[in-house]
Amino acid sequence: MPRYRLTVEYDGSDYVGWQRQDNGPSVQGAIEKAVLSLTRETVSIRGAGRTDSGVHARGQVAHLDLTREWKSYTLQNALNAHLALAGERVSILDVAEAPGDFDARFSAIRRHYLYRIISRRSPLALEARRAWWVPKPLDHDAMHEAAQRLVGHHDFTTFRSAHCQATSPLRTLDRLDVTRAGELIEIRATAQSFLHNQIRSFAGSLKLVGEGKWTPDDLQAALEARDRKACGPVAPPDGLYFMRVDY
């Protein structure tokens, strides 16, 4: 059976997340329905990351197996047509044939995420579900300085969900940068893999630094506590984007 690699963009606002669930529409389910409508095949696709409800993607990667061969551009266009017809906020950006041993999740060597904060007094209208609105001024330089305390190999118990199913809290964070362009603050994170709610936990804690409520030393102390209770507030899902996967 030929295997295909899909690069997927989606607005996660109205989905329960990437993974198929019984309590509402999922991105995985939307694509699987489009495949069924197109090919009459029931497939199970695997994504590189299981984004939560409200989290967006600009470069999620998934793979699926089909019984017949398709030209990549034909499959891409056809799936997009079926997704659009169903009113889904999902777009297939690219389709490529993949080797049989390619796995969107387990073949990944690096994942890239972006968290967007808009720091201004006025509420968001156009980007209300695409960024975290923070009405207070934030010191992005202090946030970036603090973020560097988290880079490297650490026990990230403080910054993972209490419901995280990973067997180990140890992860290697390759990059955590905070930059600003006008009212937009961007937090970019790179690692081979992340724990559940890890980036949103980073963002919420870094916001405390930006407000002057925490210092970089406070953030490091939270990391070293290895205690979920030491974490700052978890940032909302609206500002989080799954940007890219390296293989």
UniProtKB/Swiss-Prot annotation:
Active site positions: D52 (nucleophile)
Any one biological process term the GO annotation gives: tRNA pseudouridine synthesis
Endpoints of the signal sequence: none
CDD domains (UniProt xref): PseudoU_synth_EcTruA
Keywords assigned: Isomerase, tRNA processing
Pfam families cross-referenced by the UniProt entry: PseudoU_synth_1 (PF01416)
Enzyme class, first EC level, given as a word: isomerase
GO molecular function annotation: RNA binding; tRNA pseudouridine(38-40) synthase activity
Binding site for substrate: Y113
E.C. code: 5.4.99.12
InterPro entries documented for this protein: PsdUridine_synth_cat_dom_sf, PsdUridine_synth_TruA, PsdUridine_synth_TruA_a/b_dom, PsdUridine_synth_TruA_C, TruA/RsuA/RluB/E/F_N
Reactions the enzyme catalyzes: uridine(38/39/40) in tRNA = pseudouridine(38/39/40) in tRNA
PANTHER family: PSEUDOURIDYLATE SYNTHASE (PTHR11142), TRNA PSEUDOURIDINE SYNTHASE-LIKE 1 (PTHR11142:SF0)
NCBIfam families registered for this protein in UniProt: hisT_truA
Quaternary context: Homodimer.
Similarity section: Belongs to the tRNA pseudouridine synthase TruA family.
Role summary: Formation of pseudouridine at positions 38, 39 and 40 in the anticodon stem and loop of transfer RNAs.
The protein's name: tRNA pseudouridine synthase A
Organism field: Rhizobium meliloti (strain 1021) (Ensifer meliloti)
Taxonomic lineage from the root: Bacteria, Pseudomonadati, Pseudomonadota, Alphaproteobacteria, Hyphomicrobiales
